[in-house]
């Protein structure tokens, strides 16, 4: 968003492309509303075709995809010259770290390594509640045992995107 990609078509390219599995590419492309773009896309390449094969696509469809992309100059290899874009943004993929959104807004990113500390801090400062022993906990029976659920108990993971369900 800081780059100003709102209403833009964003294509990902570069030397790190071949290190990124297709499910990760799909997740990044599907998140374009979060980074403000109209669309996020990756070029068709061997990883795309391998994914199509591994997910049971008709071999004729895979061949057609490859043939068409190559005929149109859309098939990407490591030797493909860098396209001429109107603007670019460089991202060092070694700086990307796993993170979570919250506690209240998706843009409030929390590094996964900091999640435990951040959770305890948010419970105390944002919600004014202790993590354990606070009103609102619940007792449930699980596998024949009584279990206490408190704030912070992990009971379900919510996945909010159809693409992310295939790449949790």
Question: Predicted segment positions?
Answer:
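Fe-S-dependent hydro-lyases/dehydratases of central metabolism
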Residues: 1-168
